[in-house]
Swiss-Prot record:
Source organism per UniProt: Influenza A virus (strain A/USA:Texas/UR06-0195/2007 H1N1)
Domain of life: Viruses
Family from the record: Belongs to the glycosyl hydrolase 34 family.
Required cofactor(s): Ca(2+)
Means of activity regulation: Inhibited by the neuraminidase inhibitors zanamivir (Relenza) and oseltamivir (Tamiflu). These drugs interfere with the release of progeny virus from infected cells and are effective against all influenza strains. Resistance to neuraminidase inhibitors is quite rare.
Other comment: The influenza A genome consist of 8 RNA segments. Genetic variation of hemagglutinin and/or neuraminidase genes results in the emergence of new influenza strains. The mechanism of variation can be the result of point mutations or the result of genetic reassortment between segments of two different strains.
Gene: NA
Positions of the UniProt region annotated as Head of neuraminidase: 91-470
A GO cellular component entry from the record: host cell plasma membrane
Protein name: Neuraminidase
Location relative to the cell: Virion membrane; Host apical cell membrane
Intravirion-side segments: 1-6
Oligomer status and interactors: Homotetramer.
EC number: 3.2.1.18
Binding site for Ca(2+): D294, G298, D324
Amino acid sequence: MNPNQKIITIGSISIAIGIISLMLQIGNIISMWASHSIQTGSQNHTGICNQRIITYENSTWVNHTYVNINNTNVVTGKDKTSVTLAGNSSLCSISGWAIYTKDNSIRIGSKGDVFVIREPFISCSHLECRTFFLTQGALLNDKHSNGTVKDRSPYRALMSCPLGEAPSPYNSKFESVAWSASACHDGMGWLTIGISGPDNGAVAVLKYNGIITETIKSWKKRILRTQESECVCVNGSCFTIMTDGPSDGAASYKIFKIEKGKVTKSIELNAPNFHYEECSCYPDTGTVMCVCRDNWHGSNRPWVSFNQNLDYQIGYICSGVFGDNPRPKDGKGSCNPVTVDGADGVKGFSYKYGNGVWIGRTKSNKLRKGFEMIWDPNGWTDTDNDFSVKQDVVAITDWSGYSGSFVQHPELTGLDCIRPCFWVELVRGLPRENATIWTSGSSISFCGVDSDTANWSWPDGAELPFTIDK
């Protein structure tokens, strides 16, 4: 075969191979089209891949993700309808407290991006519980954590994150600029209350579902402040208590009734020898009970209960098992302020059951260390110091801090009663731990159960100082 013939032969073979390859590709395309037509022939919709839709349904954010796999729509999440949290049930009967959450914020923050916080609290809707907290606009183990022992600054903000998680920039939601705050859910939306501004002119900003609805100006120009725990919603109305005036003497105390973020009624308490700060409130059979901090002259805790018309009653827990810190040794109580070691105090809570009371308190009389729950079967009305149950939560050798109540409604739990719960702040750093330049806290929480519970210590557990402190 001469060279020309070889060239012609090779060219012919190449052309033949190219034609065969082209025919195979065309056949493949026809096959895929036919297969797709068969699968979709009986359907009347067009498949869309990776379509992400966010809807707003009854004031509750619902997130749907549609992913088309072989023309089958897989939907994650489901519609959540709104309800009205009635708050008409009674508190559940309980015999003790089961550990619910522990976020280990300080331990995780030694290496991870975790906010410097204080004043954490928990509040629940009919769908979920969330941890709320006041940040310092800084992260642990970072230079901006220096000086965060200060209570009130323009860098503080109310934020929230999923329950039990360490609060970080990656899981937290901004709620309000605030150095004092409260939040609660009425079944249709979140009400947040954030107080910020100068001591002589602070303003409370009310938001409903994230939108500003009302503001309340300091009426005494003496550090307007609120609960540092959840407000209470009953039959569509939410209630909170604010204080304005001296922390070491008679001040002004107001109850606010709020509907969808708007104040519909308010009253000032007539309580000349009482002192109410940082109240821990809960619903019980349609009324609201608040147990508060007396920073003026009481080592027992003051209370105020009121109905939806704001008709109220006031008093002090009578038990000789004293609930504040600092406090004297347990002894004879009083239904008026117990003035021994009555100055100063710490945010706390109690739950009333008839004439009995569950008292949450630090284990130390003088320092914010340890925590325990005590059941005094006659402590709401009687002045003796006899109790029948004591449950340890944090050992006296470990730091605690603020504590407060929160509840889970039947709409969340499926129970026929309101479940009582509480949280404890575990403060670390300044002013007690001088090896650090910062102040922050983690938290634990418990819920009431009528079954077995444990006596133990669930401390913060972080090893200090951090790298930034050295």
